[in-house]
Amino acid sequence: QAYDRARNLTKETARAGFIAGIIIGAVFAMLGLVAGSLFSPNPAIQKLVTTGMIVVGILMPLQGWMWALDGILIGAGDFRYLAFTCGASALVHIAALVVLVFAIGPYLPDDLARIAALWLVMGVFLMGCRGIANGLRAKGDTWIKNAVL
């Protein structure tokens, strides 16, 4: 029974994280349309802020889902797995940043494309890898066995 409750709670928490990510992401992206002036009077900087906030807002559902699973796995005491996968995800992210800076960045047309690419790399590679790792772990039984059985 504890196993079934943990499975159900995981599913519902992940869903809630995704839905919260949609809502927060939409608000964040919309705020990005007007928030640039809070950061700088320079119109070029304002456009960079707007672009970054829109990209982050679009990626927020993935992050909400991933962070919800983080919470479940942290609550289950699955620290060693999370530490390893966070470190591995960071290495993938760093490699993607190096590729972006040296191989792709010089061919991007302007600073708006570069800021969008920078945030996309963070969202896709860092958060994406963490999401894959957390999703695979949550589907398995190891963390449940360690936590509730």
List where the protein language model places each region.
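Short alpha-helical transmembrane segments in multi-pass integral membrane proteins
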Residues: 1-59, 102-149
